[in-house]
Structure formats: structure tokens, C-alpha cells
Design a protein with these regions (language model features):
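N-terminal Rossmann NAD(P)H-binding glycine-rich loop of SDR-like oxidoreductase domains
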Residues: 3-23
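Conserved C-terminal active-site "lid" loop/helix of NAD(P)H-dependent oxidoreductases
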Residues: 38, 203, 239, 262-300
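NAD(P)H-binding glycine-rich loop region in Rossmannoid oxidoreductase-like domains
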Residues: 50-90, 98-101, 116
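Catalytic helix-loop patch of NAD(P)-dependent Rossmann-fold dehydrogenases
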Residues: 86, 90, 120-167, 191
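Conserved Rossmann-fold NAD(P)-dependent oxidoreductase catalytic core, especially the SDR/UDP-sugar
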Residues: 94-134
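Flexible, glycine-rich beta-alpha linker
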Residues: 116, 160-177
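Substrate-positioning beta->alpha
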Residues: 172-178, 192-214, 221-225
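Mid/C-terminal beta-alpha module of Rossmann-like enzyme folds, strongest
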Residues: 212-275, 310-322
Length: 322
């Protein structure tokens, strides 16, 4: 059996590769990406731009193979609008066309919680999506493209769509990493509030759940929010990081009425800090995502939130989170 991972050079793809090789040492993994990464010989790298049709002339592809579609433009804000649509929508079209061409019957698609839109209310899988960013819109359209592919042969095709919260772990270089180093350098301050809900999932848990669904989902379309249940507040996340890593940092709170004008001024000055009103609003807003469906799916979590942070810390020789 072959596993094709689009965007396999990235954070989630790297962890999935490690898990696949751990469970299936003799499997063949193909990393389809524009960034070369053979992951120490664990995968076969093939240059692939998902914005263009996918042709694999030298690989024997069978209907029993599996596609993990991770390729995406996702940092928001950070890209021009057309980049989200170009990569995420054309990518979905070309990946599903590749599956169609070779008769591949199973796809796992990593979407996002962005299709829910920005709002404080709890979002379940049955919540009507109301995306309010180009990224969120492009991801919702990409979900529909994958769903159409499945519907063309619904009795045989298996599609799992996951909407992860903030994914953290070794190599993420994202929100949790910045939070840790901000705490460590005494530069982190709560933006506007301490009760902001930040739904999240450990990367090792996410890839384990993906394989679990492959084994327990025969056909049809399924959609899962992927987050710890219940989701944690930023204050709880900070407290856990402090406890596990021994930082014991106290973070002050900056009121929103101070923070927003300051962000506007800093943004106008073009400071290389990534600070602007849009990013500050994102920091202050909750990602209040319900993980109950995942919790009730029969899947057993390998880590509590605290254990996940501790495992990540251990992966960095108990020195830091990175």
C-alpha cells in the first residue's frame, strides 16, 4: 500500500510520516510537495505543485492507496486573498482529480476551523459555516470539492474531513511556540482578556486519530472537529506551560482599549513584529470549538493536555518548547 501526503514536508506531514513508519515499517510513503524533504529516507519525495494537475508516471498507484491532503496556504493574515483560493481550491480539485484518475478510494483532508467564522459561540460539526476570511472561504469550498468527489462513487469511497483547532507540537513554529518563548522572555501579555477560548490539539494525537478513522470508517463522508474537550482558555494554557516547563512566569493583562490603538500605530509604522489590528483581533477572539463528537467516537486519547505539553517538552530534551 502507498500513502500519498500532499504537503508532506510540513509540520503535520512530518509527524504523520513518523507514525506511519512506526506502525507500518515497510509501507511506501510519497511526499508530494514543493519543498523537498525526504525525512531521513522515510519517504520518497516527489516535486508536486497542487495548483497544477498531478501526474505520477513512475509510481505504481492502486485503488487501495490512501491520500492525505495537507497542502494549503494557511497563515492568516499573511497572504494576498488570491493565494488562499489559488492553492486551497485548485489544490482540492487537482488532488481529487488525481484520486479519480487512479481509482483511489480513501482521502483524509485536513481542513480548518476557519470555515466556522469568527464568533464566541460554541461551534459543533452541525453548525452552519459562516467563514469571514479568504482562508476560511477557500477551505470550505475545498471541503465541498472533496465531498463531490466522494459522492461520485459514494458506496466505495471514504472521505474523512478534520477541522483541527490550533495544532501544537515539535516543529510547529506557530502559536504555541510563540506563546512559550514570549513567556520565557517575559514578553507575553494577555491581549485584552484571559478567558479567550483557544481550541487545540496535540499533533501526535491528531495523526493518531486520522489513522484510527481510516481503520474504522468504511465509506461515506465524515467530519470531525479535532480538539481537546472541553477547549482550554489562554489562561489555562499559560498555567500548564508554566507548570510543565518550570517557567513560573506571571503575565500581565493589557486592556483592549490600549491594545487596539497601539496595534494600529505599530502596523502603520511597518514594524517587523507581525502586529496589526487584524492579528490582535484574532488573538482576542475565541476559537470555541466543540470536540464532543471526537470524544464520543470510540477513539481513546493518548495524552491529556498537560501530558501533551510534557511530551513536547521531552521531545526537546526537557529544555524548551520548539
Amino acid at each position: 500500500m502507498n500513502y500519498f501526503i500532499t504537503g508532506g514536508s510540513g509540520f503535520i506531514g512530518t509527524h504523520l510520516t513518523n507514525l506511519l513508519k512506526e506502525r507500518f515499517p515497510h509501507c511506501h510513503i510519497y511526499n508530494l510537495d514543493i519543498v523537498e524533504n525526504s525525512q531521513e529516507g522515510k519517504v520518497t519525495y516527489i516535486y508536486c505543485d497542487v495548483r497544477k494537475p498531478i501526474h505520477l508516471e513512475e509510481v505504481t498507484v492502486t485503488e487501495d492507496d490512501v491520500i492525505f491532503n495537507f497542502a494549503a496556504v494557511h497563515r492568516t493574515p499573511g497572504h494576498s486573498d488570491h493565494e488562499y483560493f489559488e492553492t486551497n481550491i485548485l489544490g482540492a480539485e487537482n488532488v481529487t482529480a488525481f484520486a479519480e484518475k487512479y481509482g483511489i478510494r480513501r482521502i483524509v483532508f485536513t481542513s480548518s476551523i476557519a470555515p466556522y467564522g469568527a464568533a464566541e459561540n460554541l461551534k459543533e460539526e452541525i453548525t452552519v459555516p459562516t467563514p469571514n476570511t479568504p482562508y476560511g472561504i477557500s477551505k470550505l469550498v475545498a471541503e465541498k470539492i472533496h465531498t463531490i468527489w466522494q459522492a461520485k462513487n459514494s458506496s466505495e469511497r471514504q472521505l474523512t474531513i478534520v477541522r483541527p483547532g490550533v495544532v501544537f507540537g515539535k516543529g510547529e513554529n506557530g502559536n504555541f511556540t510563540r506563546l512559550y518563548w514570549g513567556l520565557r522572555g517575559r514578553k507575553f501579555m494577555y491581549p485584552g482578556r484571559k478567558d479567550t477560548v483557544k481550541a487545540c490539539i496535540y499533533v501526535k494525537e491528531l495523526v493518531c486519530f486520522m489513522l484510527y478513522r481510516l481503520e474504522h470508517h468504511e465509506q461515506g463522508v465524515e467530519l470531525y472537529n479535532c480538539t481537546f474537550e472541553p477547549a482550554y482558555t489562554i489562561e489555562q494554557i499559560v498555567a500548564t506551560m508554566n507548570k510543565v516547563t518550570g517557567l513560573n512566569r506571571t503575565a500581565p493583562l493589557i486592556p483592549a482599549w490600549i491594545l487596539m490603538p497601539a496595534a494600529a500605530v505599530i502596523g502603520c509604522l511597518g514594524a517587523p513584529m507581525g502586529i496589526c489590528p487584524a492579528r490582535v483581533r484574532k488573538l482576542m477572539g475565541s476559537t470555541n470549538i466543540c470536540g464532543k463528537k471526537l470524544a464520543d467516537s470510540g477513539y481513546h486519547f493518548h495524552y491529556t493536555f498537560e501530558e501533551a505539553i510534557a511530551d513536547w517538552f521531552k521531545d526537546n530534551d526537557n529544555q524548551y518548547l520548539k
